[in-house]
UniProtKB/Swiss-Prot annotation:
Protein name: Equilibrative nucleobase transporter 1
Biological role stated in the UniProt entry: Sodium-independent purine-selective nucleobase transporter which mediates the equilibrative transport of extracellular purine nucleobases such as adenine, guanine and hypoxanthine. May regulate fatty acid (FA) transport in adipocytes, acting as a positive regulator of FA efflux and as a negative regulator of FA uptake.
TM helices/strands, residue ranges: 17-37, 72-92, 102-122, 123-143, 158-180, 277-297, 318-338, 358-380, 402-422, 426-446, 455-475
Gene3D superfamilies listed in its UniProt record: MFS general substrate transporter like domains
Keywords tagged on the record: Cell membrane, Glycoprotein, Lipid transport, Membrane, Phosphoprotein, Transmembrane, Transmembrane helix, Transport
Subcellular location: Basolateral cell membrane
Amino acid sequence: MQGRSLPFRVATLVTGLLECLGFAGVLFGWTSLVFVFKKQHYFEELCELDAGSLGNATGLDECRARDERFSLIFTLASFTINFMTFPTGYIFDRFKTTVARLIAIFLYTSATLTIAFTSADSAVLLFLAMPMLAVGGILFLITNLQIGNLFGKHRSTIITMYNGAFDSSSAVFLIIKLLYEQGVTIKASFLFISVCSAWHVGRTLLLMPRGHIPYPLPANYHYGLCSRDSPPEEDKKEAESEKLELQSKEFLSPKKETPGQQQAPGSFWSHTFSPRFAWHVVWLSVIQLWHYLFIGTLNSLLNNLASRDSAIVSTYTNAFAVTQFFGVLCAPWNGLLMDRLKHKYQEEAKRTGAVAKAAALRSVVPSLTLTSLLSLGFAVCASIPVLPLQYATFILQVVSRSFLYGCNAAFLTLAFPSEHFGKLFGLVMALSAVVSLLQFPLFTLIKGPLQNDPLYVNLMLVLLTLLTFIHPFLVNRECQRKESPREVA
């Protein structure tokens, strides 16, 4: 039965990867789309109003109001993609996969149709379309992440690969930009994306479960087209019993635990107010703010560094979008690192009698540290106003971002009880979304009082990035304390 279901599971894996790669995170290709919108004269009336109010406005800042409008749209959309993770996660938990995906398809298709029929006269509709596109995309990702549960020991690798595909999908807007330069209209491109909704519906009905894919995976588990061959009720009960047994083996110490060692998972609020969770929120929020501010203001930054030379701006915009595609290649390395270290530390725990769960949590510390280090390098390069250096900035940005979200999901999985994962994941994304709203006032500060000089803002954010190293340090110290003989005795 397992052999017959393997090709079906591989088909689910591959089509899920294509869905994340082609649709889920297209919002983060915003820079390419802004280039096209400017060519289409979106919000151009703001340039005329701004120039009229300033009287003697220079060519450098005469379109400041338009840049702020585009930045505001991206700020709202990026805020929505994180903040709505909490309610969309609840929808996924409560109403299961099929309902969540149908909602995603409705929002996504509505967004692409709105963009397709938007013009310079109705550009304000982007404030509605981009957040809908963001929420539909994140629901695609959330419903696909569970596919990792089908592949056991490769689970972390697949989860991080899907997060990398989510990042790489920003290259879709580069394709739209290149097609536009070859004469294909925005309307035609987004109508094509809208038609692809038929593919999403077909995949939802044929290749995805109606409910959730459990982890660990019970014996004789079937879904989608294979669900008609599902085992009878007795076998389902036996599979559920095996699932519970696997879960106990996954998280219990290699040593026999006495009743005193078996602890209740604790309430949701006890974990929410723990230092471990608080520092993780800081770690994610600071790094994510850097990425969102960079993506949302990149077009303006390139215009300033290139003295508003449209050809140079287009070249660097294309380079940035191309590097985003490689996120899907970078992210699995993070998952492989965590899977290998988890196996290594748990084997050591078996020999020494240490707590297995602490050993598993320890496996994410190198990934947390490496992500902070990559983000620091990205922040430093982004702060140096040298145009050719931005190629290095683009590379560091895509690598650090591809590590960021996979590491976030892995940490929450290992650091907190599984029954609270959905709520904690949604909460950490919602809190980081609130912090991400700072990108618009920071952009306004740079464009206004700082007169297009982001030096002081960049220095402040670089210093904040240094704070993210505290998180892996504290997690490592906690793991060492739990693995000590005094703790496990």
